Amino acid sequence: MSKDLEVAGRYANALFQVAQDKDLVDVFSEELTELKAALKANEDFVKLLENPTFTTEQKKNLASAVFEKINPTLRDFIYLLIDRSREDYLSVIADVYQKRVNDLNGVADADVYSVVPLSEQELTALSRVFATKMNKTKLNIQNHIDKSLLGGVKVVIGTRIYDDSLKTKLKDMERQIKA
């Protein structure tokens, strides 16, 4: 595990614990998702926030103006990150926090690779089947197009790969013929 992920994980876990204690897990989840999207969309703000020439107070004032509508506890958490010069970890903290929320709710992320975009019905069917296999209540599926598969699908959930693509079947057949 990289040091950045380890540091972000400690902060995310602490925030998650506070959220559980205050019954704000879902509120923080939504606000962190919005916050991460805002940071991604506004790189200039991120550069200002991470600029070492700004004082801690200037950074807090900037954050206060931008994040005025978020939960006060979450805003205080952001101030804590600024105080400790960890504001550059905010996006990673949001990711780790969301993973904790997903684990709590029995949700997993899945990447589905196919030759053509899958319909909502197909994605729902895949979600139902693989959620059961993974002992989860739901899968958040991201459909990716990969023309090299030739047909079928490849499903990646965490470290598990379920490959039912034509490409893999042909490679397996080739190995059997050569053996």
From Swiss-Prot:
Keywords: ATP synthesis, Cell membrane, CF(1), Hydrogen ion transport, Ion transport, Membrane, Transport
Any Pfam family the entry gives: OSCP
Keyword Zinc among UniProt keywords: no
Membrane disposition: Peripheral membrane protein
Function: F(1)F(0) ATP synthase produces ATP from ADP in the presence of a proton or sodium gradient. F-type ATPases consist of two structural domains, F(1) containing the extramembraneous catalytic core and F(0) containing the membrane proton channel, linked together by a central stalk and a peripheral stalk. During catalysis, ATP synthesis in the catalytic domain of F(1) is coupled via a rotary mechanism of the central stalk subunits to proton translocation.
Quaternary structure (record): F-type ATPases have 2 components, F(1) - the catalytic core - and F(0) - the membrane proton channel. F(1) has five subunits: alpha(3), beta(3), gamma(1), delta(1), epsilon(1). F(0) has three main subunits: a(1), b(2) and c(10-14). The alpha and beta chains form an alternating ring which encloses part of the gamma chain. F(1) is attached to F(0) by a central stalk formed by the gamma and epsilon chains, while a peripheral stalk is formed by the delta and b chains.
Alphabetized HAMAP family for the sequence: ATP_synth_delta_bact
Protein name stated in the entry: ATP synthase subunit delta
Organism: Listeria monocytogenes serotype 4b (strain CLIP80459)
Gene: atpH
